[in-house]
Amino acid sequence: MNAHASTAPHCRAGTSLSDSRLAQDLPYDYSTLLENVLDVSHVPYTHHLTVSNRANGGPVELSVLEPGVTSSGFSGMWLEGPRQGKLGSQSTKFVAPGLMYHSLEAKGLGTTLTVVFATPVAPGRSRLLARFPFRFNAAPPRFIIKNTPRWIQHQGQNGVLEDDVVFLAQQEAFVAAAEAQGQTYAQACFMPLRQDAYVLAFRQWLTRFTQGGSPWQPGALLAAHSTSPTRDQLLDRYWSHTFNCTSCSAALKNTRTASIVAAITGVAAALALTACLAARLILPAAALPVSPLALLAAVAACAFAWVKLQAIEKGFLVGPSIPKRNLITSKKANTSTKIRLV
C-alpha cells in the first residue's frame, strides 16, 4: 500500500517541531495495536494518572470524514477534542496499512502529535514505532522536554503502554476465540457509540481490503494465545525495549555500575566506622582520623543511593505490577492504598 512512503506532515524533514521517539515490541497483534491507539475515548480512564485523568472523561463524538474508508485509509475529526474541549479539536488520520496519527493544535499551548507505525512481527506480536512531535508556545515546557534524558522519557512511555497491555492481550484472545467459532468481529464486540467510529472504520478497512482482516493463517492468532502470559511477561521492558534501545541500555549499564560503586563505598564506610568505634573503645583518649558521625552519614547515604539505583534498574527490566490508576490516595489521611486490579 502506501504507508511506507508516507509520514505525518510534521514529521517530515525541515519542520520546526521537536521530536521524541520510541520503539517497543508488544505482546499483541498489529491490528489490536492500531485499534488501541486509534481509540481516543479510553485515554482518561485507562491512562488515569499517567497521561490523563478520569476527571477529563466524557462523551466522545468522533466523525469519519468523506470519502470515508478507502483502500488508502481514512481521516477523522473530534470537534470537541481532549479534556472536554479545553484544548480544541483533534484530527486523526489512518494511512494504510500501518500508520496513524492524532494532531492537536492546542489553544494557546502549541502543537502536539502522536504518530504510530504499527508493524506485524508474528501472530499475537507487533512492534510499535512511535514519534511525538511537539512545539509548545511557552518556554518552560520546551526546556523541560528537550533537556529530559531520553531514557526517562522512554520509561514514562513504557508505562503508558503497560496501562493497556493486560486488557489488550485478554481482549485479543477473546476475539480470536469468538472468530474461531464463526463470529465476525462486529458480532464479538458491541460498539454502538460514535466514540468507536475510528475503531469501526479501521476494522472495516481490514475486512474490505486485507482479505479477511489478518495477515496470518487461520487459527494462528488463537494459537498464539493458547497459553496465558505471566504478569512479568506482559510487563517486560528489557527484551521488548531496553535491550535494543541505545539510550536505555547505556543508562542501565551506568545504573548498574553506580549501584556497585554505592555498595562498595557503603561497605568500606561501614568497615571504617566499625574500626573507629573499636579504636575508641580500646583507646578512649586517642584522636580519630575520621568522625564516626561522618562515616555513619556516608553509610546511610550509600544505602539510600543503592536502594534508589535498584529501583531505577528495575524500571529498565519490568514495569510496575500495579498501574497508577489503581492507586487510591486519601487526602485526609495522606496515605495511599494499592489495589491489585488490571
Where are these regions (language model features)?
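C-terminal catalytic domain of Rieske-type non-heme iron oxygenases
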Residues: 2-342
